[in-house]
Swiss-Prot record:
This is NAD kinase. One of its GO terms (molecular function) is NAD+ kinase activity. HAMAP family: NAD_kinase. GO terms for cellular component: cytoplasm. NAD(+) binds at residues 72-73, 146-147, 157, 174, 176, 187-192. InterPro entries: ATP-NAD_kinase_N, ATP-NAD_kinase_PpnK-typ_C, NAD/diacylglycerol_kinase_sf, NADK. It catalyses: NAD(+) + ATP = ADP + NADP(+) + H(+). The keyword Kinase applies. The keyword Kinase applies. Involved in the regulation of the intracellular balance of NAD and NADP, and is a key enzyme in the biosynthesis of NADP. Catalyzes specifically the phosphorylation on 2'-hydroxyl of the adenosine moiety of NAD to yield NADP. Keywords: ATP-binding, Cytoplasm, Kinase, NAD, NADP, Nucleotide-binding, Transferase. Its EC number is 2.7.1.23. The gene is nadK.
Length: 292
């Protein structure tokens, strides 16, 4: 029976003892089964000289499965790069909540063994593309799996901006910022700010104002194909930013326009058979179990 995957990439949180232990265990276990293993260069040095070390771009190009060991933050960082390649991604949870990391670190063998035999479910998650435009020219751009957030930089204060959906004016805002989230990100920063949870199969985005200076401003859900434009008032101070997944920061100046839209790239998540999104929500968010 042919293998579902031939070349497997290992990615993890650098300088983390628990992650290093799990990566070494994975490397040994997978090598004994005859897989070709590539290790992302930031963690390869901690695993000894026998590892085949590559950068993340080469790993994405050469592997057909990537195993990310860490928390959701590590998964997000890897996903923004790997989404451009034809590669499946599965996670081993070494973080806190772990909405995107299905496998337990101490007993991954059974579930991962089934996945490697072809017994798995595939789920696609779309990404956001964020661009900062200044005087009609694009100054910077990046992608996000969870959310793009306009905010005032290091010191929290109110900012003024206008919101357009498909070039239609929606409203002006005086707030600490704006979160534009995918369904994947709806259980992250957006949830903490009062946004609704969107199931992963929804083709939608949610806009969540951060501490708006009005009682009538509420989160709104729009079609995923909508083009969102945030126009920053020229009266704002400097040092504004747009953050992508809380990792990548794009500088924003007064008068800039931020364009947020669905990316052509998408993440191919691999889940063990029987994966249930609502079970994940109950487990991670402490929801009540069935009464009868």
């Amino acid at each position: 029976m042919p293998k579902a995957f031939q070349t497997i990439g290992l990615i993890g949180k650098p300088n983390h003892h628990g992650t290093n232990l799990t990566l070494k265990r994975l490397h040994h276990w997978l090598t004994m089964q005859g897989f070709e293993i590539l290790v992302e260069e930031r963690v390869a040095a901690e695993m000894g000289p026998k590892c085949n070390s590559v950068d993340l771009l080469e790993l994405g190009d050469r592997c057909d499965l990537a195993i990310v060991v860490g928390g959701d933050g590590n998964m997000l960082g890897a996903a923004r790069v790997l989404a451009r390649f034809d590669i499946g991604v599965i996670g081993v949870n070494r973080g806190n909540l772990g909405f995107l990391t299905d496998l337990p670190p101490d007993s991954f063998e059974a579930a991962l063994g089934d996945v490697l035999e072809g017994k798995f479910e595939t789920e696609f998650r779309f990404l956001l593309e964020t661009e900062v435009h200044r005087h009609g020219n694009m100054k910077s751009s990046n992608t996000a799996v969870n959310e793009a957030v306009l905010h005032p930089g290091k010191v929290a204060h109110m900012i003024e901006f206008e919101v357009y959906i498909d070039n239609n004016f929606m409203y002006s805002q005086r707030a600490d910022g704006m979160i534009v989230s995918t369904p994947t990100g709806s259980t992250a920063y957006s949830l903490s700010a009062g946004g609704a949870i969107l199931t992963p199969n929804l083709e939608a985005l949610i806009l969540v104002p951060m501490f708006p200076h009005t009682l009538s401003s509420r989160p709104i859900v729009v079609d995923a194909c909508s083009i969102i434009k945030l126009v920053v008032s020229p009266e704002n101070g400097d040092n504004l930013e747009v953050s992508c997944d809380g990792h990548v920061m794009l500088p924003v100046l007064p008068g800039d326009e931020i364009i947020i839209k669905r990316s052509h790239e998408r993440l191919r998540l691999i889940h063990p058979k029987g994966h249930n999104y609502f079970h994940v929500l109950r487990n991670k968010l402490g929801w009540g179990s069935k009464l009868f």
